[in-house]
Design a protein with these regions (language model features):
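Bacterial Sec-dependent N-terminal signal peptides
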Residues: 3-8, 14-48
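Beta-strand/loop nucleic-acid-binding surfaces
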Residues: 62-78
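Flexible glycine-rich surface loops and low-complexity tracts that mediate binding to linear polymers
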Residues: 77-103
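Short, solvent-exposed, Trp/other aromatic-anchored flexible loops in extracytoplasmic proteins
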Residues: 78-80, 197-243
């Protein structure tokens, strides 16, 4: 189907850039930048018709809405309803959102910058098994280091790192595979997969010519919740590099994924748990979505 084919066509192209984050608050989705004067958030574009200088507002994963009144307008050609974005902004005002019943807020913001975020749906293991030799190789088995993983809105958000050859434009493919073949009681098992193709630090004579590349992806998990249910336990699996790129380590984390707007919160543990974090200034490659 078109949806299945689309899963294989997303690519990440890495280019070198220096990123520095100073500190963050207690919510996994929102980071403070520049001494607490601005924020970094995930959200989706939402059409707005209120005389705003932007054609779109941003609906954060917590349901609150960001309305641009200063700074960069969101009027670029690729802007569309529900486009997922990662935004840098400061809040200049707020009021209660009277358009809904959820008690959300409207935050009026000065927008400094934004990127669109790679969004995908899980690939089912049964689909891979239909042509296992080709699809298993295409989806990849290369390590991927998970920096952060959490549920936000209808998504599993993952911020990750991968080794990138200095100056390379090699494409990397990222997917999430749902195990629908082996039963795991009530828990849904998903595995983060990475295909680095020829860009592997332990091959050839280029072992030392690599830097860490940073990327982000959001997986829409609504399809993994069984019919008639509003939430499901989830176990996330991945393989990452150890202390050096010649070692690999199997990792896992778990939590409860709850459908949006059901009124349920699920049990706050693992991937659902808010936790205080410090993000230090580091020199890494930023993986840009194509």
């Amino acid at each position: 189907t078109a949806m299945k084919n689309k899963t294989w066509k997303f690519a990440l192209i890495c280019s070198l850039i220096v990123m520095g984050f100073t500190a963050c608050d207690d919510d996994d989705e929102y980071y403070y930048v520049g001494g607490g004067s601005s924020w970094l958030s995930y959200g989706n574009l939402e059409k707005i018709d209120n005389g705003s200088r932007s054609k779109f507002a941003i609906r954060r994963d917590d349901g609150n809405r960001l309305i641009v009144t200063e700074g960069m307008p969101i009027n670029f050609d690729g802007a569309k309803e529900d486009l997922r974005v990662y935004v840098n902004y400061s809040i200049v005002g707020s009021e209660r959102d009277e358009t809904g019943l959820e008690g959300n807020m409207n935050y009026y913001i000065r927008l400094y910058g934004f990127d669109d975020v790679l969004t995908k749906v899980p690939v089912k293991q049964s689909f891979i098994n239909e042509d296992e030799e080709v699809r298993q190789d295409s989806i990849g088995n290369d390590p991927i280091n998970v920096r952060e993983a959490w549920f936000g809105g209808r998504y599993l958000n993952v911020e990750f790192r991968i080794p990138v050859k200095d100056g390379s434009k090699e494409k990397h493919f990222i997917n999430l595979v749902q195990d629908d073949v082996v039963a795991h009681n009530d828990t849904v098992y998903v595995t983060l997969r990475h295909n680095a193709y020829s860009e592997k630090p332990d091959t050839g004579n280029d072992r030392g010519n690599y830097s860490w590349g940073r990327g982000r992806v959001s997986f829409d998990l609504t399809s993994i919740v069984p019919e008639g249910q509003t939430s499901v336990p989830v176990k996330l699996l991945w393989t990452e590099y150890g202390k050096n790129t010649s070692e690999t380590v199997n990792r896992e984390d778990s939590g409860t994924y709850t459908l949006k707007n059901t009124g349920e919160t699920g049990e706050n543990k693992g991937l659902n748990q808010d936790k205080s974090k410090m993000v230090a200034t580091e020199e890494v490659s930023e993986c840009v979505i194509e």
